[in-house]
Structures are given as C-alpha cells and as structure tokens.
Amino acid sequence: MSSMLSIRLNYLSARTGLLALFISASPLAAQTTLGQLPPAALNPAPVAAPAAPSSPQVSVTDPAAAPLAQWSVLRRGNGFGFASYANFLIAHQDWPNEAQMRAAAERAIRPGVDSPTLIIRFFNLYPPQSPAGWLRLAEAQLAVGQSNSAFDAARSAWTGGLLSSDDEARLMSRFSSQLTGQDHDARMDKLLWLRATSAATRQLNFTTPARRPGFEVRLALLTKAADAPDRLAYATNPIRLDPGFIADYMWWLRATGQGGVARQILRFNMPMAAYPASPEIWLQMLLLSAQDAAKDGQWQMAYDIASRIGTAYVPGTAVRERPFAERDAYTDLTWLAATAALNRLNAPAQAAAMFTLYANAAKSPQTQARGWYWAGRAHLSAGNAAAAEQAFENAARFSDQFHGQLASERLGRLPDVTHDAIDVPITPQERSKFLNRSVVRAMLALGRAGNWNEQSLFVRSIANAVSTDAEHILAAELATQAGRPDLNVLVGRNARNSGLSGYMKTAFPVIEVPPEHMPSWSIIHAIARQESQFDRAAVSRVGARGLMQLMPATARGTAPRAGLTYSESRLNEPAYNIALGATYFSRLMTAYGGSYVLAVAAYNAGPGNVNRWLRTLGDPRQDRDVLDWIEAIPFSETRNYVQRVLENAVVYDALNPAKANVRSNTPLSTYLGKRYPG
C-alpha cells in the first residue's frame, strides 16, 4: 500500500468483529484508496460493507467504529454490490446519505445473482423509488413463489414510467400476460407526461385502438413533428378533452412561438374528461403562461390563468400533503393571482380568497403565516373586518414567524413565544432506546473523536427523525450533552414543522457573547441562527465561515476595526467570529442610519446590491412601505433572509428580556422602522 496515502489499516480478530482503522489521509487520497479496492470487495455478500476510510480518530474499541467505516465508503461511491448497501441500510436506519445509498442499492441489484430474499427484505423496509426498482422486486418475488405480489410490482414498474429498453424487454418476457390494455395505456400516458418521447414511441403499438389516435397526436406535438398541425385539425372531442392533450398542446404552442394563443386558451375554464395524471406538469403549464402574462403587464390575464388551479386536483384534495414540486407550483400560482388581484386589479376580495388557498396549501409554518397575514390585509381592504381578524388569528398562531408576529401586532398583542413549554415524562426505557440508536451512538463517537464536520451530518439526521414530544426532549438533551446548539435549532424546527409542542426554547439556543458586544446580543443570535444554525465549523459553498458566516476578505477588513489581528484559522472560534461579525454589522447599521432592514439585507447580499435597490425600489426609510420593499427584493435568498433574521430577533428579545435589543409593544415593527403596528 502506498506510503504516500499515509493510511494504516489494522484489523483485529474477525471473531470479535472489531475493525481498527487509523487514517490520516486527504479526501483525495481516500477516494483513490476506494478505487483500489479489489473486485471481491465490490461483490454482494451476506457480510458488512467493505472497510474504508472512516472518521480519523474514532477509537477501534468504540462499537461505532466499524459501521462508521462502512458508511464512509458506501456514501462516497457507487461501485459496490447490492448486498453491501442493503445490509448496511437495514441495520442502520436514519443515517446520513440514506437517499443516496438507497438509489445506489437499487441500481446495484443484479437479477439472478443477488439474493431474492435480501431484495424483498430491503424493499419491505425501503419501498422502490423507481420503475427499475419495482421490476427488481417483482423478479425477486417471482423467484420465491410470491406470484401475486410479483404481478402487482411488475404492474407498478410498467405503469410507473421510464425503464431502459433492456428492462422493458425483461419485464415483457416475464410478465406480459399479466398486463392489460389499460396498463399499456396508463404507461403511455405516463411517458408522455414525462416527455419521454423515445420510450413512448416504443410503447405506442401496445396501446389500445381507442386511445392510440390521441396518443399519436400528443407524440407528434411533443416531437414537433411536421404533421402536428394536420393531426391537430383532425383531433376530435374525446382527444381534446384529455388533460394530457391540453398540456401537450399548450407546450407545443409555446415551443412554436404561439404563447399568446396558449394564454388565451388557458384563461378560460376548459372542459376536461378527467383530472390531469400529473398535477405537477399541469401546474407548471399554468404557471409559465401566467408568468408570461404578468411580464407583459397583462394582469387580468395573469390572474385568470393562475386562478385555474382548481383544474389540477379532484375537489377535496389536501394540497398540503402533495409532493413538494406540486405544492411549490401551486403556491406560486396562488401568490401570483393574489398579488395581481390586490395590487393591480383592485380586487381585494378575490385576493383574499387566493391568499387563503395559498395558506391552506402551504406545509411550512413560515408559508402558512405569510398566506394568512396577507389574507387578513386583503380582507381589510375589502371591508370585511371579521374575516380579517380571523385570518390574523390564524397567522398569529405562528408566533416565531415574521408574518405571524405582524399579525399579532395587528391584533394588538405581543407575539406569544413562551406558551408552548411542556413537561413530558421520559421513562428509563425510552431514554435507553433513544441513546442506543446506532445513529445516536455514531454521532457521539464522532464528537469524542473531534470530527465536527461528519458529526454535523448525523446531527441533521437525528433532527429529521424526531417524531414525538419525548424524542424531541431527548434530542434536545443530546444537543446539550454533545455541545451542538445547531442540533437544538434543527430539532426545534423539525418539532415545529411536525406539530410537536415545546419547541421554542429548543429551537432558539443561547451562546456566549463577548461583553463588549452585549448591546447587540439579540441581533447576534438572530444572525448566527440564520447563517449557521450555531454550527461553529460551518463553511458555505462560497467560503463564508463560522457562526456568523464571514467571508475571509470581509473578516480581514473588519479585524482592525474590532481591535483584532486577522487570522483565517480562527474564524471557526466562536468568540473571534462573533467579535468580527458584530463589528461588521455595527458598521452596516451606521452606514444605513440605524435601519435593521437595510443592514441585515447588506449583511447577506452586500452593500453594493442594497445601494442599487435603494435606487431602483425606493427607500423604505422614506418613500416606500417597508413590507412592500422587502417583498420587492429581487434576490429570493435575501428576501427570505431579512424576514428570518428579524423574526429571530423578536423571539430572542421575548425569551431573554434582560438582554433585549428592542423593548416595544410592537417589536417587529420597531425593527422594521414602521410607524404602525403589523
């Protein structure tokens, strides 16, 4: 083994099952070593995954050492056998990189080679994520005599979408007798919604005579065939009533420079024989045309198109429970319709209805509060005070959120951030079960080894797995034990988003602030919580470092003003990072005349961008409503950042009144520089 890699692998007795692993290799060296593993290490076997570079200092006597070594290699590569992935994932649920390893496991299955029993066991715990995965499950079930289950899985594979041509042939050779004409039509429809035209061309001959003409027209549209206009001319009502045809026709119109025609068609309710099989594609179709209309200043048309969201779902569908991509397009449409009605069309009642749909579709407290707050504002504009009060009450339930805090002010009260304290008894058995989870043991082992970066991955996994109030409390205790306030933030957010209680104290941990910066105590916490979640070793994709995420160049320029010597290696030291971050923020506050909104925006986007926005958007300190100014910030990241930091500051002030930056009956409005509540 090359001495250049500086790697020493030291295996203890196989009987004990312990793996001694000492590593001092760079990531590049570690990757090189993975590539040098012998072929035998890549073959499936009923044993743990091959040993590989793990956390540098985890003790070989620590029970977490061996699984950490396995996790380290499996998460870095795709070249290992299915059994390696499956055995690890079955034994170590909720570990980091689970989704990545699940996908690799599905790709690694070798039909006729890998154990059918292991394949079935794996998919029972981790359901297939792709049509190919369903096919592998079907083949495994057929191999062990589970014929009915195999036929169902094969049908899911066939109707689920895209398969390779080889897998298409494998499925048809084994299961074609179990597939009906309806199954073939369903697959064709799915492929067309996916815009998978090559696979759809292969599928066309399997479709039923009744549906084939419509599929031929849709395929011609999606491929922009020369005869597409002729086929359109002969498309009869059964075809034109198909939502798949409508979506493909709109796509073709936009693709051939006829977007205006598409808008005119979409602005009116279209008769359809069914609801679209792909709400996501349907909503995206509406969104593109509505946005095009808005860009051209056609606000009534933009509203008309965006308000057709009801065509995407069967009545009564809980949009909040639909996949993110669907919810995202749906809320974009309702927001566009609502703001067009309120700000452009002088139709506040219609705006209130759209804001209400937006709030009801939203999953996160942040988005729900935003929708309810603006629904309240729209109801007020429409003269409906009772409906406005109820909307503000709905928003005020989210007292740690920007718009929930504004709603509380509208109702004449302070945001209630202390109401959810709970005391859930934890039994010794519950505590022992939690602490003995392999993901918790691994997280603690990495902490003992001083491996902060990899421990951070486990911190996130533990936070995401919290599902009960008891687990919430235990995870919060673990955060304190491990010295990981970022785990507290993540656990608290997950508890909030999952509807659990008592998250406020957990989600807003406290850190030590240098005495000279105590006057900025709340805003320091507010920025650090948003920037790094209090992860002192955080490094952003652009190189910002530490609690307050300082770019090295900014830190270098700020150090003399803070009375400090610049040292890049110290940016991960909390006190040093806070001193520089607080000094830089103080300079921004001075530069912008004490405006928290502008200083916070500049901390995120830079003073140059903020100065440009002051020229193009107006000045929220003078001639522009501050809420409208924030909504008009062209960078979505900065728009979100300003709201999150200021809502954090309000919570920290309320939870720690002796250290509050702002003491007011309208705290958020005070931070915003507004003269009116809410």
List where the protein language model places each region.
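Bacterial N-terminal signal peptides
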Residues: 15-27
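N-terminal leader/linker segments that initiate helical-solenoid repeat arrays
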Residues: 31-79, 417-438, 448
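Alpha-helical repeat scaffolds
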Residues: 56, 81-89, 115-125, 149-158, ...
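Alpha-helical adaptor scaffolds
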Residues: 74, 90, 98, 102-110, ...
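Catalytic glycan-binding domains that act on GlcNAc-containing polysaccharides
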Residues: 85-91, 261, 273-282, 296-309, ...
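TPR/TPR-like (Sel1-like) alpha-helical repeat modules
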Residues: 93-94, 127, 142-143, 147-163, ...
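Residue at a conserved register position within TPR or TPR-like alpha-solenoid repeats
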Residues: 109, 141, 191, 220, ...
